[in-house]
Every structure is written in structure tokens, then in C-alpha cells.
Amino acid sequence: MKLGKVVGTVVLSQCIEAYHGQALHLVMELDENLETVGTAQVCATWEARSEEEIVIFEVAREAANVADPAIPSDASIIGKVEKVHIDW
């Protein structure tokens, strides 16, 4: 699992059946200072998210198993983060 920030939304005009009803967002991974790093990834999710929301997302094969039934995805949002506390 990774901590990330929603930075955009993806709108499909046509899609495969498995993606009907799915929301797609662009998510960037966050580092230990909650700064974005790397490049944005398209993540599937069951519920629309707002830009700037912090989320937990899964990548690789595990991402496909988030939905029931599984969807063909290599990145999925699995939860919304309400608060982050870092104790240095």
C-alpha cells in the first residue's frame, strides 16, 4: 500500500464493461513529508474523490482484487485518509 494525493480525474468516453461504474483518478505518491513524488498513476476506485484528497492506494496485481468482482487494474484507491500523524 502507498500513501498518495489525488491530483486529477480521468473521464472515459468509451470503456470495457469492467470499468462501468468505476471512477478513475490520477494519484501521485507522497513521501514522508507529504510531498508528491514520481509521476501520476491512473487509479480505479468505487467512489469519486476530490482533488487534493489523501488516499491509500495499491499497485500491481493486488490492485485488481480491490473490486468484487476483480477488475483489470494495476492501481486502485482502497481508502480515504482522514488524518496523518508523523511522530519524529
Language-model-detected regions and their locations in the chain:
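A generic structural signal for residues embedded in beta-strands
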Residues: 6, 13, 57-58
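Short, conserved beta-turn/loop elements at beta-strand boundaries and strand-helix junctions
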Residues: 11-18, 82-86
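Short aromatic-glycine-enriched beta-strand elements
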Residues: 18-26
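C-terminal structural segments of small proteins and small subunits
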Residues: 56-88
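Short, acidic/hydrophobic/Gly-rich beta-strand patch recurrent on exposed beta strands
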Residues: 25-29, 42-43, 56
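Loop/turn positions that initiate beta-strands
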Residues: 51-53
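Short alpha-helix capping/helix-loop boundary micro-motifs
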Residues: 38-45, 63
